[in-house]
Curated annotation (Swiss-Prot):
The UvrABC repair system catalyzes the recognition and processing of DNA lesions. A damage recognition complex composed of 2 UvrA and 2 UvrB subunits scans DNA for abnormalities. Upon binding of the UvrA(2)B(2) complex to a putative damaged site, the DNA wraps around one UvrB monomer. DNA wrap is dependent on ATP binding by UvrB and probably causes local melting of the DNA helix, facilitating insertion of UvrB beta-hairpin between the DNA strands. Then UvrB probes one DNA strand for the presence of a lesion. The gene is uvrB. It comes from Streptococcus agalactiae serotype Ia (strain ATCC 27591 / A909 / CDC SS700). This is UvrABC system protein B. PANTHER family: UVRABC SYSTEM PROTEIN B (PTHR24029:SF0). ATP binds at G44, A45, T46, G47, T48, G49, K50, T51. The lineage of its organism: Bacteria, Bacillati, Bacillota, Bacilli, Lactobacillales. The keyword Transport does not apply.
Length: 663
């Protein structure tokens, strides 16, 4: 039994109070949520304090909240900020726990089976367990997640029913407790005591919960009764205090009791026989033998150990779901009345839409060639419409909301005024002829004042050439390309802020979520090349990178002004006018943001995002552009396959399928 606390309240801790148009945005969002509004958009300009507004809304509506970001880096930034705002509440982090992940796959052309291979980040696994246990124990929970939250996780009911509940005075034998711990996938290890393990010393059992990393629990027996329970330091054994109730959550999210396990095994056997019969009828004898051999091995492991590698592929039978029924996910661990906030929604909602198709095409190949039963297709991410069915109330947060969000609601709450009085930058267009010399002069002006520069190009080749040119001219410059992993990227941004170098060049990496107040100039090369990097939303996001410095300035190098450029400049000018009027009315002088340069947080040491690095709003492409992109990606996929880099090839293929899925 779990002692759930439903009366906790969120307590926001901040030295700031709402300012600019934050008070109006907070009040409107809260009133709409309390009035039962299902969906609304917070359209907040870069640097207006959207995260602070989100925190105020969470504190006032006091509902468990899921915040979804489109990659681990942004999720990590948000997690750190929410932890600071809510030190007394449960702020949790839920992203893919793989440092390295090669999905199970089969390549028919070369008859190559690629076994699933992965490396799990222990720190992130701990944080995932902490998230699910917090959701079942209390109401004041914020979970910051990536799109991993729409992947299958196991039944929350089985997970909750498997919790081992202990109290002083409870009658239970030591051996019964040991059996219970093994049933919920804890391992006995009297020497190497770490998460998900227990050790035994006479009448004393010490348990290290899967959601902790420093503190464990010591259960002392007197006969067949628990004498007392103490919290201890796992390393030193020092007693920290006595505990009146201890709930030990399972060491895995995929739990099934013995009764359900036997039912599941019967269904797996029946499905295997049907599949073998089907293959034999079609003359596919190798596939028939393969699926029987693999499935019988898994069944034996399930009977003996209660677990097998790839157990998630049998989750439909384990959970008692029907064919095609959506899997249980993190969303099912929340109570019905919870709040969802989608950060950078114009990117995140596109990811949520694209997850299902890429996963299914890979699994169908495994099923067709006898590596997996058809039920493996139901171990999958949610479709977008299934995600929508979980939504009770949702706030889309973006400076540039996408068409999908705009189609979901007419309620748009604008947040344009920055608490610092900073204005949207001035934007000017200059001819591309002679742009290198012109740009070099602008960079030198900024460097002399101790300011930094962002340059965004359209191609990798141009970025590399420009980097070489600027280095020859004596400029301290770095190029941030898509091969750079999360931790390195964070280090590069930190070095830029510290002045190790002055200019950062990128392609699609200098948009959402990169906040460097020292940057006063953003240069956009080939601004008139209409496409997914130079559409209205992309340009507004890029312009926003200069909005955290009082000297913010944007130069677009182009030979003509496209419709996207004009709309982006018009929107920036509209915001700038409103901001200037507000400053004049209230006597505010714009001040560059003073942002502490933090040490790298541990969770950013995980390896990159859940999806291929190239995350793009494909819905904005024309049909012709999509076809060209597909052709280019297919070539890259073939090259990766020839080099036996099947993981990269599979990632590129998923992007191609996402492109093809667009109507």
């Amino acid at each position: 039994m779990i002692d759930r606390k439903d009366t906790n309240r969120f307590k926001l801790v901040s030295k700031y109070s709402p300012s600019g148009d934050q008070p109006q945005a907070i009040e409107t969002l809260v009133d709409n949520i309390e009035g039962g509004e299902k969906a609304q958009i917070l359209k907040g300009a870069t640097g207006t304090g959207k995260t602070y507004t989100m925190s105020q809304v969470i504190a006032q509506v006091n509902k468990p909240t899921l915040v979804i970001a489109h990659n681990k880096t942004l999720a990590g930034q948000l997690y750190g900020e929410f932890k600071e705002f809510f030190p007394d509440n449960a702020v949790e982090y839920f992203v893919s726990y793989y440092d390295y992940y090669q999905p199970e796959a089969y390549v028919p052309s070369s008859d190559t089976y690629i076994e699933k291979d992965s490396s799990v980040n222990d720190e992130i696994d701990k944080l995932r367990h902490s998230a699910t246990s917090s959701l079942l124990e209390r109401n004041d929970v914020i979970v910051v997640a990536s799109v991993s939250c729409i992947y299958g996780l196991g039944s929350p009911k089985e997970y909750a029913d498997s919790v081992v509940s202990l109290r002083p005075g409870q009658e239970i034998s030591r051996d019964q407790l040991l059996n219970n711990l093994v049933d919920i996938q804890f391992e006995r290890n009297d020497i190497d005591f770490q998460r998900g393990k227990f050790r035994v010393r006479g009448d004393v059992v010490e348990v290290f919960p899967a959601s902790r990393d420093e503190h464990a629990f010591r259960i002392e027996f007197f006969g067949d009764e628990i004498d007392r329970i103490r919290e201890i330091e796992s390393l030193t054994g020092r007693v920290l205090g006595e505990v009146e109730h201890l709930a030990i959550f399972p060491a895995t999210h995929f739990m099934t009791n013995d009764e359900h396990m036997e039912e599941a095994i019967s269904k797996i056997q029946a499905e295997m026989e049907n599949q073998v019969e089907l293959f034999e009828k079609e003359g596919k004898l190798i596939e028939a033998q393969r699926i029987r051999q693999r499935t019988e091995y898994d069944i034996e492991m399930l009977r003996e150990m209660g677990y097998t590698n790839g157990v998630e592929n049998y989750s439909r039978h384990m959970d008692g779901r029907s064919e095609g029924e959506p899997p249980f996910t993190l969303l099912d661990f929340f109570p019905e009345d919870f709040l969802i906030m989608i950060d950078e929604s114009h990117m995140t909602m596109g990811q949520i839409k694209g997850m299902y198709n890429g996963d299914r095409s890979r699994k169908e190949m495994l099923v067709n060639y006898g590596f997996r039963l058809p039920s493996a297709l139901d171990n999958r991410p949610l479709r977008r419409e299934e995600f929508e069915s979980h939504v009770h109330q949702i706030v889309y947060v973006s400076a540039t909301p996408g068409d999908y969000e705009m189609g979901q609601t007419d309620t748009v709450v604008e947040q344009i005024i920055r608490p610092t009085g900073l204005l949207d930058p001035e934007v000017e267009v200059r001819p591309s002829m002679g742009q290198m010399d012109d740009l070099l002069g602008e960079i030198n002006l900024r460097t002399e004042k101790g300011e930094r520069t962002f340059i965004t190009t359209l191609t990798k080749r141009m970025a590399e050439d420009l980097t070489d040119y600027l280095k020859e001219m004596g400029v301290k410059v770095k190029y941030m390309h898509s091969d750079i992993k999360t931790l390195e990227r964070t280090e590069i941004i930190r070095d830029l802020r510290l002045g190790v170098f002055d200019v950062l060049i990128g392609i699609n990496l200098l948009r959402e979520g990169i906040d460097v107040p020292e940057v006063s100039l953003v240069a956009i090369l080939d601004a008139d090349k209409e496409g997914f990097l130079r559409n209205e939303r992309g340009l507004i996001q890029t312009i926003g990178r200069a909005a955290r410095n009082s000297n913010g300035h944007v130069i677009m190098y182009a030979d003509k002004i496209t419709d996207s450029m004009q709309r982006a400049m018009d929107e920036t000018a509209r915001r700038r006018r409103l901001q200037m009027d507000y400053n004049e009315k209230h006597g505010i002088v714009p001040q560059t943001i003073k942002k502490e340069i933090r040490d790298l947080i541990a969770i950013t040491k995980s390896n990159d995002s859940d999806k291929p690095e190239k995350v793009v709003d494909y819905s904005s492409l024309s049909k012709k552009e999509r076809q060209a992109e597909i052709k280019a990606l297919q070539k890259q996929m073939q090259e990766a396959a020839e080099l036996l880099d099947f993981e990269l090839a599979a990632q590129i293929r998923d992007v191609i399928l996402k492109l093809k899925a667009i109507d």
